[in-house]
Amino acid sequence: MSDFKTIQFVSVVIPVYNEQDSLSELLKRTIAACDSMGKQYEIVLVDDGSSDRSAEILREAAQRPGSRVVAVLLNRNYGQHSAIMAGFNHIKGDLVITLDADLQNPPEEIPRLVEAADQGYDVVGTIRQDRQDSWFRRRASRLINGLIQRTTGKSMSDYGCMLRAYRSSVIKAMLHCHERSTFIPILANSFARRTIEIPVKHAEREHGESKYGLMKLINLMYDLVTCLTTTPLRALSIFGSVVALLGFAFAVLLILMRLTLGPQWAAEGVFTLFAVLFIFIGAQFVGMGLLGEYIGRIYNDVRARPRYFIQNVVRANQPDEEQEK
Protein backbone atom coordinates (compact mmCIF):
# COMPACT_ATOMS: atom_id res chain seq x y z
CA MET A 1 0.00 0.00 0.00
CA SER A 2 2.97 2.34 0.26
CA ASP A 3 3.04 5.49 -1.85
CA PHE A 4 6.28 7.45 -1.62
CA LYS A 5 5.18 10.46 -3.66
CA THR A 6 5.72 13.83 -2.04
CA ILE A 7 2.52 15.10 -0.49
CA GLN A 8 1.02 17.98 -2.45
CA PHE A 9 -2.53 18.23 -1.08
CA VAL A 10 -3.68 17.69 2.51
CA SER A 11 -7.26 17.01 3.58
CA VAL A 12 -8.20 17.50 7.24
CA VAL A 13 -11.32 15.58 8.30
CA ILE A 14 -13.01 16.65 11.55
CA PRO A 15 -16.18 15.03 12.95
CA VAL A 16 -18.38 17.51 14.84
CA TYR A 17 -21.12 16.77 17.36
CA ASN A 18 -22.53 19.59 19.50
CA GLU A 19 -19.31 21.63 19.47
CA GLN A 20 -20.71 25.11 18.72
CA ASP A 21 -18.61 26.77 21.43
CA SER A 22 -15.28 25.51 20.10
CA LEU A 23 -15.87 25.71 16.32
CA SER A 24 -14.75 29.31 15.84
CA GLU A 25 -11.39 28.71 17.53
CA LEU A 26 -11.07 25.30 15.87
CA LEU A 27 -11.45 26.78 12.40
CA LYS A 28 -9.09 29.67 13.12
CA ARG A 29 -6.31 27.46 14.50
CA THR A 30 -6.71 24.71 11.90
CA ILE A 31 -6.58 27.17 8.99
CA ALA A 32 -3.49 28.85 10.49
CA ALA A 33 -1.77 25.48 10.94
CA CYS A 34 -2.56 24.43 7.37
CA ASP A 35 -1.42 27.78 5.94
CA SER A 36 1.96 27.32 7.62
CA MET A 37 2.62 24.09 5.65
CA GLY A 38 2.85 25.82 2.27
CA LYS A 39 0.76 23.07 0.65
CA GLN A 40 -2.70 22.94 -0.84
CA TYR A 41 -5.31 21.87 1.67
CA GLU A 42 -8.99 21.53 2.48
CA ILE A 43 -10.81 21.16 5.79
CA VAL A 44 -13.74 18.73 5.70
CA LEU A 45 -15.98 19.12 8.74
CA VAL A 46 -18.71 16.50 9.21
CA ASP A 47 -21.67 17.44 11.38
CA ASP A 48 -22.88 14.23 13.01
CA GLY A 49 -26.49 15.28 13.64
CA SER A 50 -25.74 18.03 16.18
CA SER A 51 -28.68 19.46 18.13
CA ASP A 52 -27.01 22.86 18.70
CA ARG A 53 -25.85 25.45 16.12
CA SER A 54 -22.87 23.42 14.90
CA ALA A 55 -24.37 22.63 11.49
CA GLU A 56 -25.32 26.27 10.92
CA ILE A 57 -21.80 27.45 11.82
CA LEU A 58 -20.23 24.90 9.46
CA ARG A 59 -22.55 25.90 6.63
CA GLU A 60 -21.64 29.57 7.08
CA ALA A 61 -17.91 28.77 7.15
CA ALA A 62 -18.14 26.69 3.96
CA GLN A 63 -20.15 29.33 2.06
CA ARG A 64 -17.64 32.14 2.54
CA PRO A 65 -16.03 33.21 -0.76
CA GLY A 66 -12.72 31.41 -1.29
CA SER A 67 -13.28 29.18 1.75
CA ARG A 68 -11.33 25.93 1.91
CA VAL A 69 -13.90 24.47 4.28
CA VAL A 70 -16.24 21.70 3.14
CA ALA A 71 -19.28 21.04 5.35
CA VAL A 72 -20.77 17.54 5.22
CA LEU A 73 -24.08 17.51 7.10
CA LEU A 74 -25.52 14.17 8.23
CA ASN A 75 -29.24 13.93 8.91
CA ARG A 76 -28.76 12.43 12.40
CA ASN A 77 -26.14 11.09 14.77
CA TYR A 78 -24.34 7.98 13.47
CA GLY A 79 -21.23 7.99 15.65
CA GLN A 80 -17.72 9.35 15.36
CA HIS A 81 -16.24 6.74 13.05
CA SER A 82 -19.19 6.73 10.64
CA ALA A 83 -18.93 10.53 10.45
CA ILE A 84 -15.23 10.27 9.62
CA MET A 85 -15.96 7.72 6.89
CA ALA A 86 -18.50 10.17 5.45
CA GLY A 87 -15.74 12.78 5.36
CA PHE A 88 -13.38 10.33 3.64
CA ASN A 89 -15.85 10.11 0.76
CA HIS A 90 -15.39 13.83 0.05
CA ILE A 91 -11.62 14.33 0.27
CA LYS A 92 -9.22 15.30 -2.52
CA GLY A 93 -5.88 15.10 -0.72
CA ASP A 94 -2.85 12.84 -1.06
CA LEU A 95 -2.79 12.73 2.74
CA VAL A 96 -5.72 12.80 5.14
CA ILE A 97 -5.47 14.07 8.72
CA THR A 98 -8.21 13.21 11.21
CA LEU A 99 -8.74 15.51 14.16
CA ASP A 100 -11.29 15.82 16.97
CA ALA A 101 -13.27 19.05 17.26
CA ASP A 102 -12.80 19.48 21.02
CA LEU A 103 -9.28 21.01 20.66
CA GLN A 104 -7.74 18.57 23.12
CA ASN A 105 -5.40 17.63 20.28
CA PRO A 106 -3.92 20.94 19.08
CA PRO A 107 -4.34 21.61 15.32
CA GLU A 108 -0.82 23.07 15.44
CA GLU A 109 0.47 19.46 15.40
CA ILE A 110 -0.84 18.91 11.84
CA PRO A 111 2.40 20.03 10.06
CA ARG A 112 4.40 17.52 12.12
CA LEU A 113 2.17 14.66 10.95
CA VAL A 114 2.52 15.79 7.34
CA GLU A 115 6.31 15.97 7.74
CA ALA A 116 6.39 12.43 9.17
CA ALA A 117 4.16 11.06 6.39
CA ASP A 118 6.43 12.69 3.80
CA GLN A 119 9.16 10.29 4.93
CA GLY A 120 7.25 7.46 3.22
CA TYR A 121 4.88 6.25 5.93
CA ASP A 122 1.36 5.05 5.10
CA VAL A 123 -0.04 5.81 8.56
CA VAL A 124 1.20 8.27 11.17
CA GLY A 125 -0.21 7.62 14.63
CA THR A 126 0.21 9.80 17.69
CA ILE A 127 0.85 9.33 21.40
CA ARG A 128 -0.72 11.88 23.73
CA GLN A 129 1.84 13.33 26.15
CA ASP A 130 0.81 14.49 29.64
CA ARG A 131 -2.83 13.54 29.09
CA GLN A 132 -5.37 15.92 30.60
CA ASP A 133 -8.19 13.37 30.93
CA SER A 134 -9.67 11.98 34.13
CA TRP A 135 -8.14 8.97 35.87
CA PHE A 136 -11.06 6.81 34.70
CA ARG A 137 -10.59 7.82 31.05
CA ARG A 138 -6.85 7.13 31.20
CA ARG A 139 -7.36 3.69 32.73
CA ALA A 140 -10.11 2.80 30.24
CA SER A 141 -7.88 3.95 27.37
CA ARG A 142 -4.98 1.84 28.62
CA LEU A 143 -7.24 -1.21 28.89
CA ILE A 144 -8.62 -0.74 25.37
CA ASN A 145 -5.16 -0.15 23.88
CA GLY A 146 -3.87 -3.30 25.54
CA LEU A 147 -6.81 -5.29 24.18
CA ILE A 148 -6.19 -4.00 20.65
CA GLN A 149 -2.46 -4.76 20.77
CA ARG A 150 -3.06 -8.34 21.94
CA THR A 151 -5.77 -9.10 19.39
CA THR A 152 -4.22 -7.40 16.34
CA GLY A 153 -0.51 -7.83 17.00
CA LYS A 154 0.04 -4.17 16.06
CA SER A 155 2.45 -2.30 18.30
CA MET A 156 0.85 1.16 18.13
CA SER A 157 0.17 2.29 21.67
CA ASP A 158 -2.50 5.03 21.57
CA TYR A 159 -5.41 4.03 19.36
CA GLY A 160 -7.77 6.39 21.19
CA CYS A 161 -6.08 9.51 19.79
CA MET A 162 -7.85 10.52 16.57
CA LEU A 163 -5.11 12.94 15.51
CA ARG A 164 -3.66 10.68 12.81
CA ALA A 165 -2.50 10.81 9.20
CA TYR A 166 -3.39 8.38 6.41
CA ARG A 167 -2.16 8.14 2.83
CA SER A 168 -4.94 8.37 0.24
CA SER A 169 -4.20 4.77 -0.84
CA VAL A 170 -5.10 3.58 2.66
CA ILE A 171 -8.27 5.70 2.63
CA LYS A 172 -9.36 4.17 -0.69
CA ALA A 173 -8.82 0.67 0.71
CA MET A 174 -10.92 1.48 3.78
CA LEU A 175 -13.76 2.86 1.66
CA HIS A 176 -14.02 -0.54 -0.03
CA CYS A 177 -14.84 -2.12 3.34
CA HIS A 178 -18.56 -2.26 4.05
CA GLU A 179 -18.79 -3.71 7.55
CA ARG A 180 -21.03 -1.72 9.87
CA SER A 181 -18.67 -1.68 12.85
CA THR A 182 -15.57 0.26 11.86
CA PHE A 183 -12.73 1.33 14.13
CA ILE A 184 -10.69 3.44 11.73
CA PRO A 185 -7.17 3.33 13.29
CA ILE A 186 -7.20 -0.47 13.37
CA LEU A 187 -8.72 -0.81 9.90
CA ALA A 188 -6.11 1.57 8.49
CA ASN A 189 -3.24 -0.34 10.10
CA SER A 190 -4.47 -3.56 8.46
CA PHE A 191 -3.81 -1.97 5.05
CA ALA A 192 -0.64 -0.03 5.90
CA ARG A 193 2.83 -1.32 5.19
CA ARG A 194 4.82 1.32 7.06
CA THR A 195 3.52 2.98 10.23
CA ILE A 196 5.03 5.29 12.80
CA GLU A 197 3.95 7.05 15.99
CA ILE A 198 5.00 10.52 17.10
CA PRO A 199 4.37 12.26 20.46
CA VAL A 200 1.86 15.12 20.45
CA LYS A 201 0.58 17.58 23.02
CA HIS A 202 -2.73 17.13 24.80
CA ALA A 203 -4.86 19.88 26.31
CA GLU A 204 -7.81 20.05 28.67
CA ARG A 205 -11.26 20.25 27.16
CA GLU A 206 -12.39 23.88 27.42
CA HIS A 207 -15.99 23.59 26.17
CA GLY A 208 -18.67 21.00 26.84
CA GLU A 209 -18.17 17.42 27.98
CA SER A 210 -16.65 14.32 26.43
CA LYS A 211 -19.00 12.39 24.14
CA TYR A 212 -17.54 9.11 25.42
CA GLY A 213 -19.26 8.34 28.71
CA LEU A 214 -19.19 5.06 30.61
CA MET A 215 -21.79 3.29 28.46
CA LYS A 216 -20.14 4.39 25.20
CA LEU A 217 -16.79 3.08 26.43
CA ILE A 218 -18.42 -0.25 27.34
CA ASN A 219 -20.05 -0.42 23.91
CA LEU A 220 -16.71 0.41 22.31
CA MET A 221 -15.12 -2.46 24.22
CA TYR A 222 -17.75 -4.90 22.93
CA ASP A 223 -17.32 -3.52 19.39
CA LEU A 224 -13.57 -4.03 19.53
CA VAL A 225 -13.82 -7.55 20.95
CA THR A 226 -16.33 -8.74 18.35
CA CYS A 227 -15.13 -6.89 15.24
CA LEU A 228 -11.39 -7.46 15.61
CA THR A 229 -11.04 -11.16 16.23
CA THR A 230 -12.75 -14.51 16.75
CA THR A 231 -10.43 -15.31 19.66
CA PRO A 232 -13.26 -15.01 22.26
CA LEU A 233 -15.19 -17.75 20.42
CA ARG A 234 -12.13 -20.00 20.49
CA ALA A 235 -11.65 -19.21 24.17
CA LEU A 236 -15.28 -20.21 24.83
CA SER A 237 -14.70 -23.55 23.09
CA ILE A 238 -11.64 -24.21 25.23
CA PHE A 239 -13.49 -23.12 28.36
CA GLY A 240 -16.42 -25.39 27.48
CA SER A 241 -14.09 -28.35 27.04
CA VAL A 242 -12.41 -27.68 30.40
CA VAL A 243 -15.80 -27.34 32.12
CA ALA A 244 -16.98 -30.63 30.59
CA LEU A 245 -13.87 -32.42 31.86
CA LEU A 246 -14.23 -30.89 35.32
CA GLY A 247 -17.92 -31.83 35.37
CA PHE A 248 -17.08 -35.42 34.49
CA ALA A 249 -14.36 -35.54 37.14
CA PHE A 250 -16.74 -34.06 39.72
CA ALA A 251 -19.38 -36.69 38.87
CA VAL A 252 -16.83 -39.47 39.35
CA LEU A 253 -15.81 -37.90 42.68
CA LEU A 254 -19.44 -37.81 43.87
CA ILE A 255 -19.91 -41.48 43.01
CA LEU A 256 -16.72 -42.47 44.84
CA MET A 257 -17.64 -40.40 47.91
CA ARG A 258 -21.11 -41.94 48.00
CA LEU A 259 -19.66 -45.45 47.82
CA THR A 260 -17.07 -44.61 50.47
CA LEU A 261 -19.02 -42.45 52.95
CA GLY A 262 -22.58 -43.59 52.28
CA PRO A 263 -25.79 -41.86 51.16
CA GLN A 264 -25.74 -39.35 54.05
CA TRP A 265 -22.71 -37.56 52.54
CA ALA A 266 -24.41 -37.34 49.14
CA ALA A 267 -27.39 -35.51 50.67
CA GLU A 268 -25.12 -33.01 52.39
CA GLY A 269 -23.22 -32.39 49.17
CA VAL A 270 -26.31 -31.31 47.29
CA PHE A 271 -25.71 -27.60 48.02
CA THR A 272 -22.18 -27.80 46.68
CA LEU A 273 -23.56 -29.37 43.54
CA PHE A 274 -26.07 -26.52 43.14
CA ALA A 275 -23.34 -23.90 43.61
CA VAL A 276 -21.19 -25.47 40.90
CA LEU A 277 -24.25 -25.82 38.66
CA PHE A 278 -25.10 -22.12 38.96
CA ILE A 279 -21.52 -21.18 38.06
CA PHE A 280 -21.72 -23.26 34.89
CA ILE A 281 -25.14 -21.82 34.01
CA GLY A 282 -23.77 -18.29 34.41
CA ALA A 283 -20.83 -19.13 32.14
CA GLN A 284 -23.28 -20.47 29.55
CA PHE A 285 -25.22 -17.20 29.54
CA VAL A 286 -22.00 -15.22 29.08
CA GLY A 287 -21.09 -17.44 26.14
CA MET A 288 -24.56 -17.10 24.62
CA GLY A 289 -24.39 -13.31 24.94
CA LEU A 290 -21.00 -13.17 23.22
CA LEU A 291 -22.19 -15.49 20.47
CA GLY A 292 -25.26 -13.26 20.07
CA GLU A 293 -22.99 -10.24 19.56
CA TYR A 294 -21.24 -11.98 16.67
CA ILE A 295 -24.52 -13.12 15.11
CA GLY A 296 -25.95 -9.61 15.46
CA ARG A 297 -22.97 -8.15 13.62
CA ILE A 298 -23.32 -10.70 10.84
CA TYR A 299 -27.02 -9.80 10.57
CA ASN A 300 -26.27 -6.08 10.34
CA ASP A 301 -23.60 -6.64 7.69
CA VAL A 302 -25.84 -8.93 5.62
CA ARG A 303 -28.57 -6.27 5.54
CA ALA A 304 -26.00 -3.97 3.90
CA ARG A 305 -27.68 -0.78 5.06
CA PRO A 306 -25.68 2.45 4.56
CA ARG A 307 -23.48 3.62 7.44
CA TYR A 308 -24.93 7.12 7.26
CA PHE A 309 -27.23 9.42 5.27
CA ILE A 310 -25.83 12.72 4.02
CA GLN A 311 -28.31 15.56 4.05
CA ASN A 312 -26.13 18.24 2.41
CA VAL A 313 -22.59 18.89 1.26
CA VAL A 314 -21.70 22.59 1.29
CA ARG A 315 -18.72 24.04 -0.60
CA ALA A 316 -17.72 27.61 -1.41
CA ASN A 317 -19.40 29.09 -4.51
CA GLN A 318 -21.31 25.86 -5.19
CA PRO A 319 -24.96 24.95 -4.59
CA ASP A 320 -25.64 22.48 -1.79
CA GLU A 321 -25.30 18.86 -2.84
CA GLU A 322 -27.91 16.45 -1.56
CA GLN A 323 -26.99 12.82 -1.61
CA GLU A 324 -27.30 9.52 0.18
CA LYS A 325 -24.48 7.28 1.32
From Swiss-Prot:
Q: Which CDD domains match?
A: DPM1_like_bac (cd04187)
Please give the catalytic activity noted in the UniProt record. Answer: UDP-4-deoxy-4-formamido-beta-L-arabinose + di-trans,octa-cis-undecaprenyl phosphate = 4-deoxy-4-formamido-alpha-L-arabinopyranosyl di-trans,octa-cis-undecaprenyl phosphate + UDP
Q: Which domain of life is it from?
A: Bacteria
The EC number of this protein is 2.4.2.53
* Alphabetized InterPro entries for the sequence: ArnC_tfrase, Glyco_trans_2-like, Glycosyltransferase_2, Nucleotide-diphossugar_trans
Pathway assignment: Glycolipid biosynthesis; 4-amino-4-deoxy-alpha-L-arabinose undecaprenyl phosphate biosynthesis; 4-amino-4-deoxy-alpha-L-arabinose undecaprenyl phosphate from UDP-4-deoxy-4-formamido-beta-L-arabinose and undecaprenyl phosphate: step 1/2; Bacterial outer membrane biogenesis; lipopolysaccharide biosynthesis
Keyword Phosphoprotein recorded: no
One Pfam entry for this protein is Glycos_transf_2
- What is the topology of this protein in the membrane according to its UniProt annotation? Multi-pass membrane protein
Q: Where are the transmembrane segments?
A: 236-256, 270-290
Main localisation:
membrane
Gene Ontology MF: a single term: phosphotransferase activity, for other substituted phosphate groups
One Gene Ontology BP term is: lipid A biosynthetic process
Q: Which GO terms describe its cellular component?
A: plasma membrane
Claim: Protease is one of the keywords in the record: no
- State the top-level EC class: transferase
Q: Where in the cell is it found?
A: Cell inner membrane
Tell me the keywords, alphabetical order.
Answer: Antibiotic resistance, Cell inner membrane, Cell membrane, Glycosyltransferase, Lipid A biosynthesis, Lipid biosynthesis, Lipid metabolism, Lipopolysaccharide biosynthesis, Membrane, Transferase, Transmembrane, Transmembrane helix
Q: Which residues form the signal peptide?
A: none
General function of this protein: Catalyzes the transfer of 4-deoxy-4-formamido-L-arabinose from UDP to undecaprenyl phosphate. The modified arabinose is attached to lipid A and is required for resistance to polymyxin and cationic antimicrobial peptides.
* Family, per entry: Belongs to the glycosyltransferase 2 family.
Protein name per its UniProtKB record: Undecaprenyl-phosphate 4-deoxy-4-formamido-L-arabinose transferase
Q: List the source organism.
A: Edwardsiella ictaluri (strain 93-146)
